[in-house]
Amino acid sequence: MRGSNNTDLFDPKTEMDSNFSRHGSSSEGDFGFAFNDSNFSDRLLRIEILGGPSDSRSDAEGCTSIADWARHRKRRREDNKKDNGVAISDIVACAEEQILTDNNQPDMDDAPGGDNLDDEGEAMVEEALSGDDDASSEPNWGIDCSTVVRVKELHISSPILAAKSPFFYKLFSNGMRESEQRHVTLRISAQEEGALMELLNFMYSNSLSVTTAPALLDVLMAADKFEVASCMRYCSRLLRNMPMTPDSALLYLELPSSVLMAEAVQPLTDAAKQFLASRYKDITKFHDEVMALPLAGIEAILSSDDLQIASEDAVYDFVLKWARGQYSSLEDRREILGSRLALYIRFPYMTCRKLKKVLTCSDFEHEVASKQVLEALFFKAEAPHRQRILAAEGSDSMNRRFIERAYKYRPVKVVEFELPRPQCVVYLDLKREECAGLFPSGRVYSQAFHLGGQGFFLSAHCNMDQQSSFHCFGLFLGMQEKGAVSFGVDYEFAARDKSTKEEYVSKYKGNYTFTGGKAVGYRNLFGIPWTSFIAEDSQHFINGILHLRAELTIKRSSDLH
């Protein structure tokens, strides 16, 4: 009777879910001794291998690197599509596997001797391509699918395969007559043969004999096709432990969109992102390489907090340059910037001068630019503790726009006045760790700020006090532009102090006539040794932050005489 004795091996909702959620295979039983052994098997798996001699090599054969594997796979896929319409071996884009029956054949129950045919009947499984649900018709692959170049028969245990794979579980427990038949036929392309044999062996032994990256990728793709998540995770782990290259990392980034079970390869994808972010953290050092990277690689680099770059303004400029180089169409550029790359630019840490330029940049849709600039300005207007809260809230999410990167030039807050004289107040905050890292002779620069059309910057130093011969903390004010420009400025340095209820206390005042490239300041801003300045009980760090302020006022022409 059809389906009368088809009892589930186990409840799929509980047992299989727990099995597929495991992240390793070491704790699972080793049934390698039962592989292809009739004594421990209840079915016979017939593997029909299709294709001609040109199709006999797998993607991994002859490949010495990931790049070779990717090129081989891409070339074969394109050749098959060009010559045959559809690639039989394209397991990346395969549709759901279906059981094929022939509706024109008589019902087996009505056939002569039907009661005795269960052991001899076969369930045939092959790819159902192009979404056609009519499984009774032979799919047209553009090659002679009736040509079976090889046949392999294996003794299999349906409980072992079903426990590892929802594909085989459905095949063996779907209530149809085929699930009760002892013979099951799989029809595959010649390129898949080696990977499938490795996969079947893994389902018994939880181990693989292949060790190269191309071969592991073949097995991983086969595991995805036959829904063996544990094997995908195993391959992913082995690939993560191998030396990575830019080519392999970029290939791994594409896996989630190329496989059905993307979660199984997520750790490998994350490792690829970390590799690219670490390798290209100084994008100026690898400028040409980075400019040639695809979108996924650029996103991996821009997502890093450790990007070694002068400022977020420089990140913005780089993104625009890359987008213009990759997308000649303004419409395409706006689409990719608005929907993808804008998410990785941390607009709240851009200078106001650059944010103004964002609003008039034709590469961004006006609505996108306005939204990003308004959000950035609101963030800048928040109190420091609110900014820290916003940054903490975004630290676990994909969108890290409120988190400050490790910029080469430290961000500053600037308040500008035009009357009664051009003036600006500049706030620079330094973490205790940043200050500690300056010892014994380091320096850190602020981002540029502007007054009277001239660019200025602050720099914090660890100096040797020339009079007392000990290290100390110094602060300097410099002008960017070099040349014969003469610029008179009144300045004042101040810092917050615990002893004065955390108010800003003036440290030094002075005036200086700048010429391009010159700087003025104080080698020992606090008048104490470095050890006292950096000590745990230091009065100058409030919640681990050193708060500095500089006021600059342009001298009137009458003041210069």
From Swiss-Prot:
Region: Disordered, residue numbers: 1-31, 100-119
Gene3D superfamilies per record: 1.25.40.420, Apoptosis, Tumor Necrosis Factor Receptor Associated Protein 2, Chain A, Potassium Channel Kv1.1, Chain A
Record's compositionally biased regions (Polar residues): 17-28
Keywords, ordered alphabetically: Ubl conjugation pathway
Single Gene Ontology BP annotation: response to red light
Keyword NADP: no
Coiled-coil regions, chain positions: none
Chain intervals with Acidic residues compositional bias: 107-119
Entry note about domains: The BTB/POZ domain mediates the interaction with some component of ubiquitin ligase complexes.
Record's function text: May act as a substrate-specific adapter of an E3 ubiquitin-protein ligase complex (CUL3-RBX1-BTB) which mediates the ubiquitination and subsequent proteasomal degradation of target proteins.
Name assigned to this protein: BTB/POZ domain-containing protein At2g46260
